[in-house]
Swiss-Prot record:
It comes from Talaromyces stipitatus (strain ATCC 10500 / CBS 375.48 / QM 6759 / NRRL 1006). The gene is ecm14. It is found in: Vacuole; Secreted. PANTHER family: INACTIVE METALLOCARBOXYPEPTIDASE ECM14, PROTEASE FAMILY M14 CARBOXYPEPTIDASE A,B. GO terms for cellular component: extracellular region; vacuole. This is Inactive metallocarboxypeptidase ecm14. Its main location: other.
Amino acid sequence: MYRQDHVFVVLCAVLLAGQVTAVPAGTGINPHSPPLGPFESVRFASQTQSQIASSRGPFTWLRDTVIERIWGIDKKHSNKVGSQPRPEKSWSRYGSDIVLRMEVHSTEEVEALADAVNILFLDVWDSNENYVDIRMAKEVVPSLLGLLPQSLQKSHTLLIEDLSKAIYESRYPTRDYQRHTIDQTDCHTVPRPLDVADLFFDHYQPFNVILQWMRLIVSMFPSHAQLVNVGVTHEGRDIPAFRLGVRSRDDEQEGPRKTIMIVGGSHAREWISTSTVAYIAFQLVTEFGNSVAITKLLEDFDWVLVPTINPDGYVYSWDMDRLWRKNRQPTGLPFCPGIDLDRSWGYEWDGQGTRANPCSESYAGNNPFDSIETRTIAEWAYNQTQDKRTDFIGFLDLHSYSQQILYPYSYSCSTVPPTLENLEELAFGIAKAIRMTNQEAYAVKSACEGVVTTDKGNGQRVSANVESTGGSALDWFYHQLHAKYSYQIKLRDKGMYGFLLPPEHIVPTGREIFNSVLVLGHFLLGEDANALEWEFIPGSKSTSEQENGSSRTFDRLFFNMNEDELEKPGNDRDYSSVVEEDVYQDEGWGLW
């Protein structure tokens, strides 16, 4: 702990004492890059109600009027959904926006909702087999309901009543500079003493601060931390990553290095994913040499951690639009830039449905790997394997929200992954680690099951989805690079805050996911892990603290499951023999 305290005293002095600067397009991760330009803060605008109404624009007004005239929507649907007073300073683009949760029960309802979303250009926040969360202006609610079947017109609840106010409060919380923990039973906060090691994670950080922090970390721990560039963005920014690990002098003769890759920030607005990747990296770096288990994990494996694979979008979400999702690459429509990075990967790309609609939040581009970010990251990862330096055995793609642990495949439920049994067993182990940290429940399911499924009566299950599901990073790393322990983890919460998760959730979320990473490492080490002493980071209300007040007891409680519940990696079915289309046997890339 002394080591972490010392690190953060230096971090605070370096990062907080200087002027905050922005990372302009084209700036690399080289510590000797030219001086950075001034940070341009977000502008707020006070609005009257008439200004809010007019800010929707003539196109929105015309669209709603035409829809109401064609479908004859009853004015009774124009209920008041938001009545809270607007803060003095707010985000004008979301002046009257709300978030609704539509409860769905059949394929027909999902298909009708998907059509309405496309017609009205709505923003889907989350969707699964039970509900769909949608952001819209409250003036659009009657238009939406008029497009839906009768069964859906009353099957909705209000999640966020005043989105602009929620955005403002998430950026500028009115609370003392004292750490709070989350009361998991009623979502209230209870004060606890400030931990110096949590200072950097007390708030979300802009990209320029994250980059300076990464440079500082590798300069302080050069023996086991490197800063590498895994790709480039449309605006010319490098995509920085930590590469953690300790290689022996005989590394050249040892063959490819087993590597786990953890990424966040595919969708720019999912700030908690970026902070969580940074938290995991910090714990691995600073506990090397202190923790026997973590030292072993960095000696046996390389860890590539990318806080955000979408720096352009992340910067834009800070400077201009907090809820921006895609990258910033131009499309066929000048006023609708951006490609959804998690729909742009080459394996089972299915972007035909959104090809004609660049304004869609799930726009996958015109072709597989149309986004510069996914293409350059794929090239980097593939080249690492071709140089016989890297063998990707694990991949974690962090997102928000909904608290789910998803395993391949995303594109279809009709294809069974060849390592399904071990994928499920490890996923349940990860979920157990999270639950024992903070009592947070994470569901475990196939990534394709975020849809409505119905039984036609003949045993055939039919599925429908509000968004396309192909072209995911999860499927590409699992199938193309054979990273056989690949997961997409959707972090907190379950909809109360959505993408606007308050900063007091950063550390609790980081702790529970870091404990999940320890479970992954324990699993990958196999029998060698049993001889090590494993120490979890206790949560605010961990099982160990409640029952025994001991983190060691918590470790034993969890890892007792390995002998009876978790299979060792050596028990896998032969992966390469199951995957017939081995990309490494193709001429050239064979990846696109």
